[in-house]
Regions:
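Juxtamembrane transmembrane-helix boundary motif
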Residues: 1-8, 23-116, 128-138, 148, ...
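Short hydrophobic/aromatic, small-residue-rich stretches within specific transmembrane helices
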Residues: 10-17, 143, 147, 178
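Hydrophobic, membrane-facing alpha-helical anchors
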Residues: 14-26
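Short arginine-rich
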Residues: 19, 152-153
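Conserved, well-structured core segments that form the ligand-binding/active-site neighborhood
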Residues: 119
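Hydrophobic/aromatic end-of-helix segments at the C-terminal termini of transmembrane alpha-helices
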Residues: 124-125
Length: 178
């Protein structure tokens, strides 16, 4: 059914990310570039945010989801080209708090946005880590590990919410995951 194409793509994307995220997390762990002390508290927020994000995405039209994804791509592209996060981090190391009280909150918005657009969260987690005073290596490694809970919770959310609607799902699909 045409009305669920984007939701199916996002849910399936998150399900496939889960497996590659495990491999990536292990690889970065072996290089000692994962800040595990942040992964766990970030994950709490990410799991909650990803499930809520999947539920919110399920209420949006294909057209609105396409616009959200397009805007995300433009903003991330501008950030990557401009290097704004790295420039700010050089100017003011740790200009975003990564205290034990703030980290789950950061995780929740990362999980929420990531599950809406179908990504593992690295585009948000890496800049957050850099803004929090960590180096790029730690940011990428920690983001890789955080992709596991985002992908798992997001995919489960899409499976659940896809079963609560009256649409013709493709044969073999579990909710919005194919």
């Amino acid at each position: 059914e045409a009305s669920i194409i984007v939701l199916m793509a996002i849910g399936t994307s998150l399900a496939s990310i889960f497996f590659s995220a495990i491999s990536s997390a292990l690889s970065h762990h072996n290089k000692r570039s994962v800040e595990w002390s942040l992964v766990m508290p970030l994950s709490v927020g990410m799991i909650v945010g990803a499930v809520i994000g999947a539920g919110y995405a399920a209420t949006l039209s294909n057209e609105n989801l396409k616009w959200i994804i397009t805007i995300f791509l433009i903003v991330i592209g501008i950030e990557m080209i401009s290097g704004l996060t790295q420039a700010l981090a050089k100017k003011d190391k740790g200009f975003i708090s990564l205290s034990k009280f703030m980290v789950p909150g950061h995780g929740s918005w990362i999980g929420f946005l990531s599950s809406i657009i179908g990504i593992g969260g690295g585009s948000f987690t890496t800049p957050l880590m850099i803004a929090g005073g960590y180096n790029i290596r730690q940011g990428i490694g920690t983001a890789a590990a955080c992709g596991v809970p985002i992908a798992a919770a997001g995919a489960i959310g899409y499976m659940y919410y896809g079963q609560t609607v009256e649409v013709n799902l493709p044969s073999g699909a579990v909710g919005y995951v194919f």
